[in-house]
Amino acid sequence: MELLQTIAAVRNYVAAARQRGLSIGLVPTMGYLHEGHLSLARAARQQNDVVIMSIFVNPTQFGPNEDFARYPRDLERDRELAAGAGVDAVFAPAVEEMYPAGYATYVQVEGLTEVLCGASRPGHFRGVTTVVSKLFNIVQPDRAYFGQKDYQQALVIKRMVRDLNFPIEIITIPTVREADGLALSSRNKYLTPEQRRSALSLHRALHLGSDLIKAGEREAAVVRRAMEKEITAWPETRIDYVAISDADTLKPLEKIAGRVLLALAVWVGNTRLIDNVVLEVND
């Protein structure tokens, strides 16, 4: 497996693959890989001739008081895991390579980015869409792979791809979970054993909300209150949001119908975790 650290090196690598008529799949990550990332890589491996994974902790998607400095990094470990999942090349640039001095251009999707995670993390999605559009320009893949756990992010990127005419297919892969239901996240490593138990509140709340809807409850406020009650029953939890939204527009629902997104963000101690589930509600 190749390690590429400059944009020029990636362009050369991609040009050689294209000369041979090979298709390219891109798996964008911030590293500290877990089984969720590896499931993206394996899907890319099945569907493309060449798989490139980017590993870049992107400073522009972190707010001033967020965890950019302490976000876990371990490139050697990541390279081994990526190789094991069938990745052909890892692109791991320095910050200066992606954002040289005087960098001043940003990509912003409006509307979809102003709710849910966008409401509590202003500027976050601007950073995501900027770095992803840069990666798309550098790698020019046929397909790019994102996880369902970051549902809003995937939706925003699909909108960006449509609006800016990127000739790239966006593929979302189901959330990978621990045996007890906790969604895999690089940030789970911040949790103490007690907090790890409290982190189960996210999955439990989604389960509860889904069960209420399947049993016929159609008032979003009733379902949301039940989910909030489940979360706050656990120690060290603090709700950022619990939302019941249209899965395509992210607009909040009062009456539950159609493709419905149950999404939540919860602080467990000093760690912010997210999770979601999508339901088809056709009465």
UniProtKB/Swiss-Prot annotation:
Record-listed ATP binding positions: 30-37, 147-150, 176, 184-187
Intrachain disulfide bonds: none
Residues annotated for (R)-pantoate binding in this entry: 61, 153
Main location: cytoplasm
EC number per UniProt: 6.3.2.1
Residues annotated as catalytic: 37 (proton donor)
Top-level taxonomic group: Bacteria
Class of enzymatic activity (EC top level): ligase
Subcellular location: Cytoplasm
Keywords attached to this entry: ATP-binding, Cytoplasm, Ligase, Nucleotide-binding, Pantothenate biosynthesis
Biological pathway: Cofactor biosynthesis; (R)-pantothenate biosynthesis; (R)-pantothenate from (R)-pantoate and beta-alanine: step 1/1
GO cellular component, one term: cytosol
Positions that bind beta-alanine: 61
Catalysed reactions listed for this entry: (R)-pantoate + beta-alanine + ATP = (R)-pantothenate + AMP + diphosphate + H(+)
A GO term, aspect molecular function: ATP binding
Pfam families: Pantoate_ligase (PF02569)
An example Gene Ontology biological process: pantothenate biosynthetic process
Function: Catalyzes the condensation of pantoate with beta-alanine in an ATP-dependent reaction via a pantoyl-adenylate intermediate.
Quaternary structure, from the entry: Homodimer.
Extra information: The reaction proceeds by a bi uni uni bi ping pong mechanism.
Name of the protein: Pantothenate synthetase
Organism listed in the record: Moorella thermoacetica (strain ATCC 39073 / JCM 9320)
Biological classification of the source: Bacteria, Bacillati, Bacillota, Clostridia, Moorellales
